[in-house]
Amino acid sequence: MSRQSKMPFPSPQPETEPTLGFTIWISLRRGISPQAEQVFERSLADYMDSRDLQWWGTHLCAAVSGDDRDLTETDQVDLLLWLVEGVTPTTVEIGPLGPGTGLPARRDSVPVVRAQSSDLMLIPMIWLYRAARVDARQVLQMLGGFSTISTVH
């Protein structure tokens, strides 16, 4: 099993108000083998461990929080971009935790930011973010902000 090594993401500007955590939903590529899904799950666990992030749920829907800290927009964007750069996920959505629960929110009940690996605009966005030309908040805004309520089919 190979581990993806990525350059650390810069944090060019002061962070905005931290949050306790967020919910993440991941849609995998169709026809993925069980072995490839296990490799993805392990890679995700390694990513979370390397950044002192805790997650409750599955590798497809989880609540993410900091080990001993609140999370910021940079934490959200770093994870989102790491996921869409991979081969396995096709769509990644990030939203708030369930109101008052600290658990993953229902996908159709909260506003989300959505990124799809097939979106060619992500490539320059990732480059600009890594070059510290845009910050995490700007990336979230370019992706549409937390304005869309996901429709589950």
PLM regions: where:
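Long, contiguous binding/interaction regions
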Residues: 1-153
